[in-house]
């Protein structure tokens, strides 16, 4: 799954893009959470205490030890196989709250576009 391009537009637009990609199944929940987390706090301007964003901040925090994306190339196959089981478990566990939060974010952040 490839990540959506999020290097232009407002933080809200970028989050809506990632959230839609999660809903469409184009990116995983964990990968999407990591991207959404980048737009929270600091210079990005989105408040990570927002209930819908908090869902993704929490998922990112709880799964930050899991190899998702390009870092997988640096992992040994046997270790990766074990982590893949944990990734699958986490994706299933977080699926419902992530999809709910993603749908809220898309509705909120695409309302004015």
Model-derived features: positions:
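Acidic, Ser/Pro/Thr-rich low-complexity regulatory regions
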Residues: 1-113
């Amino acid at each position: 799954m490839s990540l959506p391009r999020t290097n232009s537009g407002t933080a809200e637009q970028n989050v809506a893009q990632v959230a839609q990609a999660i809903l469409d199944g184009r990116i995983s929940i964990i990968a999407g959470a990591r991207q959404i987390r980048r737009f929270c706090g600091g210079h990005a301007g989105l408040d990570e205490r927002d209930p819908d964003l908090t869902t993704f901040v929490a998922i990112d925090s709880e799964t930050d030890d899991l190899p998702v994306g390009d870092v997988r190339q640096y992992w040994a196959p046997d270790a990766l196989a074990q982590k893949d089981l944990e990734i699958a478990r986490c994706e299933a566990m977080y699926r419902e709250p992530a999809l709910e939060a993603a749908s809220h974010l898309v509705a909120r952040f695409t309302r004015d576009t």
